[in-house]
Amino acid sequence: MQQNQRIRIRLKAFDHRLIDQSTSEIVETAKRTGAQVRGPIPLPTHKEKFTVLISPHVNKDARDQYEIRTHKRLIDIVEPTEKTVDALMRLDLAAGVDVQISLG
């Protein structure tokens, strides 16, 4: 790969255990192939709250509240080798994790 190349990986998941497991797999794979890793950097958790009326008609005071938390992590791989890219492409991550990869 070119000099001063870097791979930025952003991970999103609802379950923090899944995202931590996936992050550790990516970091281990990158370090094993000789790349320099920065991170994982925990980004702010997005909390989305929903309020639902329990009663179908009256009793406006009776409500339930639900919340969805989206956990995010950022990993920078500095000066990746060809081995690093191949190993990351073959890596199988959990189904509940959204992965965005950008080259910079």
Curated annotation (Swiss-Prot):
<dbReference type="InterPro" id="IPR027486">
    <property type="entry name" value="Ribosomal_uS10_dom"/>
</dbReference>
<dbReference type="InterPro" id="IPR036838">
    <property type="entry name" value="Ribosomal_uS10_dom_sf"/>
</dbReference>
<keyword id="KW-0689">Ribosomal protein</keyword>
<dbReference type="GO" id="GO:0003735">
    <property type="term" value="F:structural constituent of ribosome"/>
</dbReference>
<comment type="function">
    <text>Involved in the binding of tRNA to the ribosomes.</text>
</comment>
<dbReference type="Pfam" id="PF00338">
    <property type="entry name" value="Ribosomal_S10"/>
</dbReference>
<dbReference type="GO" id="GO:1990904">
    <property type="term" value="C:ribonucleoprotein complex"/>
</dbReference>
<dbReference type="InterPro" id="IPR018268">
    <property type="entry name" value="Ribosomal_uS10_CS"/>
</dbReference>
<comment type="subunit">
    <text>Part of the 30S ribosomal subunit.</text>
</comment>
<dbReference type="GO" id="GO:0006412">
    <property type="term" value="P:translation"/>
</dbReference>
<dbReference type="InterPro" id="IPR001848">
    <property type="entry name" value="Ribosomal_uS10"/>
</dbReference>
<keyword id="KW-0687">Ribonucleoprotein</keyword>
<dbReference type="GO" id="GO:0000049">
    <property type="term" value="F:tRNA binding"/>
</dbReference>
<comment type="similarity">
    <text>Belongs to the universal ribosomal protein uS10 family.</text>
</comment>
<dbReference type="GO" id="GO:0005840">
    <property type="term" value="C:ribosome"/>
</dbReference>
<protein>
    <recommendedName>
        <fullName>Small ribosomal subunit protein uS10</fullName>
    </recommendedName>
</protein>
